[in-house]
Curated annotation (Swiss-Prot):
Protein name: Arginine deiminase
Entry keyword annotation includes Hydrolase: yes
Gene: arcA
Catalytic activity: L-arginine + H2O = L-citrulline + NH4(+)
Active-site residues, record numbering mapped to chain: 399 (amidino-cysteine intermediate)
HAMAP family in alphabetical order: Arg_deiminase (MF_00242)
Record organism: Latilactobacillus sakei subsp. sakei (strain 23K) (Lactobacillus sakei subsp. sakei)
Localisation per UniProt entry: Cytoplasm
Broad EC category: hydrolase
Family under the similarity heading: Belongs to the arginine deiminase family.
InterPro entries: Arg_deiminase
Keyword tags: Arginine metabolism, Cytoplasm, Hydrolase
Chief site of localization: cytoplasm
Pfam family, one: ADI
Record-linked SUPFAM superfamilies: Pentein
Length: 411
């Protein structure tokens, strides 16, 4: 059986990708709640949708099949006849304390067509949408000025994070912050019930019910044998070690994990915001993660004796990558040309967050013109997409895409 998920590299020709078009959830961000929702600004919906549509069309123009999260989730719910069960689980994880409010929300949402229900859950439900006649004391004592019964999920257009393709399977992730924890429920229902994905041979290496956090922006598939995973603000060292044990014990094909430690802050929240693979022997890197002499704390995880994990500490990232990928030379291309002002400015707007759609061919944000020109000087084909509003969410082309199928690299 051919798995519907097949990703054995970061750079193999991209065949199928999962996106989420920004919707009403973006307009439901307010200044009072945007930081809790992990946003630093409020995108303008018509423009962010136009930019995202251009991003999707760029992928199609390069032979990529584009699927949308909202459509797959609705199709899966209908195919599995699990509309009520899915809604119950979503409501339970939305931290609604009032039984009256939860019951009213269920009646309101379940009456909708499935796709409308999915999009409304993603967008959030405002208090003025439902008239609750009978209120309990808990409702009276709640913050009367708070405008939502269910919070919006504006980060959903970053499909990379809630789940991550890995070989012939994926991880469905326990997200770090409450603002994003419900997001992985959509991929969970797709894998369980969508006819294209359920029972079709794809392995779930890790599910969303784990205690320790992991997010897809930290998960890089360097080859069919080697992964790189960031120890970051969003992914814990414990979760990496747990995943290593599962992969090594279950014939995943992966033999080595490079756990790369990066600063734990919002600007560098995931490994792919500071480090991406763009060709067989080329990577982008943000100088801000490198110490003296370009050193980066890297821990090599390999199978040990008696199902134990062997861990080796190195600091020469370039050498670690050369050895792991078995290439004689390797180039780390600095974001913003390594300039003290340009590099952090362009990294803030995801100058390091490139999406490779084939070896040496990447999609980038147009605003990072110094980094883009620098990549071209290294022989990389750069396809720019507009980004004035997309970039406000602090994620780039790699963040906005979950590859489902890539061609294998030629040996």
């Amino acid at each position: 059986m051919t798995s519907p998920i097949h990703v054995n590299s970061e750079i193999g020709k991209l065949k199928t990708v999962l996106l989420k078009r920004p919707g009403k959830e973006v307009e439901n961000i307010t200044p009072d709640i945007m930081y809790r929702l992990l946003f630093d600004d409020i995108p303008y919906l018509p423009t962010i949708q136009k930019e995202h549509d251009q991003f999707a069309q760029t992928l199609r123009d390069n032979g990529v099949e584009v699927l949308y999260l909202e459509n797959l989730a609705a199709e899966a719910i209908d195919a599995g006849d699990v509309k009520e069960a899915f809604l119950d689980k979503m409501l339970n994880e939305s931290h609604i304390k009032s039984p009256q409010v939860q019951a009213a929300l269920k009646d309101y949402l379940i009456s909708m067509a499935t796709l409308d229900m999915v999009e409304k859950i993603m967008a959030g439900v405002r208090t003025n949408e439902i008239d609750i006649k009978s209120k309990a004391l808990i409702d009276v004592s709640a913050d009367g000025d708070y405008p939502f019964y269910m919070d919006p999920m504006p980060n959903l257009y970053f499909t990379r994070d809630p789940a991550a393709s890995m070989g012939d399977g994926l991880t469905i992730n326990k997200m770090t912050f409450e603002a994003r924890q419900r997001e992985s429920m959509f991929m969970e229902v797709i894998m369980q019930h969508h006819p294209r994905f359920a029972n079709q041979g794809a392995q779930v290496w890790r599910d969303r019910d784990h205690i320790d956090r992991m997010e897809g922006g930290d998960e890089l598939i360097l080859s069919d044998k080697v992964l790189a995973i960031g120890i970051s603000q969003r992914t814990s060292a414990q979760s990496i070690e747990e995943l290593a044990k599962v992969l090594f014990a279950n014939h995943s094909g992966f033999e080595k994990i490079l756990a790369i430690k990066i600063p734990h802050n919002h600007a560098m929240m995931h490994l792919d915001t500071v480090f991406t693979m763009i060709d067989y022997d080329k990577f982008t890197i943000h100088p801000g993660i490198q110490g003296a002499g370009g050193m980066v704390d890297t821990y090599i995880l390999e199978p040990g004796n008696n199902d134990e994990i062997k861990i080796t500490h190195q600091t020469d990232l370039e050498k670690v990558l050369r050895d792991a990928l078995e290439v004689p030379e390797l180039t780390l291309i600095p974001c913003g040309g390594g300039d003290a002002v340009v590099a952090p400015r362009e990294q803030w707007n995801d100058g390091s967050n490139t999406l490779a759609i084939a070896p040496g061919v990447v999609v980038t944000y147009d605003r990072n013109y110094v980094s883009n020109e620098n990549l071209r000087q290294y022989g990389i084909k750069v396809i720019e997409v507009p980004s004035s509003e997309l970039s406000r969410g602090r994620g780039g082309p790699r963040c906005m895409s979950m590859p489902l199928v890539r061609e294998d690299l030629k040996k």
